[in-house]
Amino acid sequence: MTKFMFFGFSTFLITTEDGLNILIDPYIDDNPAAPMKCADLPKIDLILASHGAFDHMKDTGKIAMRDQSRIICGGETMNLLLDQGVPKELITQTVWGLAVRQCGITVRPVVSMHRSSVRLSDGTAMDGFALGFIIYLPDGTRVYNASDTALFSDMKLIGELHHPQVGLMNVTIENCFDFLPEFLTGEMTPYEAALASQWLGLEYAVACHYTNKDNKDVAEFESILNLMKDKNGTGSPVPVIMNPGETFVYPLKKK
């Protein structure tokens, strides 16, 4: 069994059947919804940092240096981590398509229609592109991490090539930061996220990029997927909606 613990925003702790801890997009200490602080985390073996936005990788460096965690990320994110003092040997830089293996886990980066911007301590600005991830776990589970992507038609191809069973899908945006404008939608609307989940052929579509599951976009995403399931029968993705601190276990125990 694989456990997915949700921290709010896009942070997940994945614990594999053999006890390996994989942290995705760690934004914890300044995250008001997080169920714990970085100091309370178990030892983290592997961190996947999809892009340089603060709400996706702010705590990556401190956790990696504490636990000697391996990090998989893009080039601009690597430069930010090096600037923060993270040892280079902990970082594996990659790009779309270049599969890498760390801690016995194969990770295939895929396209994410989103940018990645960082600023180093000397003021240097760097831009890159966000990484989506297909995570191949030892028990055969394949996880897709969307990484703030907008909808794009090649999600169908990602599904055909990789057959992910579980998807971590951005379905909304948190308008909770005073220094950002108020956005009318997330990178995907609830309908687009539901359509993407269907294109990917997911068994379970786990909603993310929020702090409270009472969010209207989250409810709409769940409703649309349930309507798809009623219309199409078996084969449509099952929505998984969690509050921060809750855990989804895959595969579900058969009744």
Language-model regions: role of each:
Residues 4-6, 27-34, 90-93, 147-149, ...:
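Short gly/ser/thr-rich secondary-structure transition/capping motifs
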Residues 36-100, 104-118:
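Active-site HxH/HxHxD metal-binding segment of metal-dependent hydrolases
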Residues 109-141, 149-154, 161-162, 166-168, ...:
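Active-site-proximal loop/helix segment associated with metal-binding centers of metalloenzymes
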